[in-house]
């Protein structure tokens, strides 16, 4: 739900009504509604995919290290991790919505705030740090891994996610 709300607010800020004039035969209001609905549905699906990715990743890591966590606990922890990240995202989107900051130009959770529009700085996102830390807690508390191994895996996850963000910024 939080992902859907943040996607809806983001689409509210990102949708440029002038760019929607270019499609003939479709009413502008209908096109705007379709765009917002598509953004909301995409936000919901991305949340489900994130939960499954974190769950499968934590399950694989715990199987590699031969710990015996409860699968329900890992799934619950994965849901909690994604929920916390989505709440942070929703709060940031609400703040940006209230102050009229364009999410394409500014991201107040990244280094992009110092140089608006710079996508490479936008790749260095505070949510990555939060997500990696929460993944470490998930592996340690629920996955029954030692804090040392959980921290190492969390750092590897952080580097992987940062690399994906940088590749996405460069493309």
Model regions and ranges:
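Hydrophobic core of alpha-helical transmembrane segments in multi-pass integral membrane proteins
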Residues: 1-7, 155-164
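Selected alpha-helical membrane-embedding segments in polytopic membrane proteins
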Residues: 1-89
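Membrane-helix interface segments in multi-pass membrane proteins
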Residues: 6-42, 96-124, 167-171
């Amino acid at each position: 739900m939080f992902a859907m709300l943040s996607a809806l607010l983001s689409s509210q800020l990102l949708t440029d009504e002038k760019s929607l004039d270019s499609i003939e035969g479709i009413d502008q209001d209908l096109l705007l509604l379709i765009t917002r609905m598509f953004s909301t549905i995409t936000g919901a699906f991305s949340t489900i995919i994130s939960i499954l990715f974190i769950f499968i990743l934590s399950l694989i890591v715990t199987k590699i290290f031969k710990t015996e966590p409860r699968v329900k606990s890992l799934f619950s922890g994965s849901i909690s991790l994604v929920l916390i990240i989505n709440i942070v995202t929703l709060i940031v989107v609400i703040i940006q919505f209230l102050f009229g900051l364009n999410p394409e130009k500014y991201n107040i959770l990244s280094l992009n705030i110092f140089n608006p529009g710079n996508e490479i700085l936008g790749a260095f996102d505070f949510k990555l740090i939060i997500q990696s830390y929460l993944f470490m807690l998930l592996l340690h508390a629920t996955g029954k891994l030692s804090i040392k191994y959980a921290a190492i895996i969390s750092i590897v996850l952080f580097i992987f996610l940062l690399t994906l963000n940088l590749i996405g910024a460069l493309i």
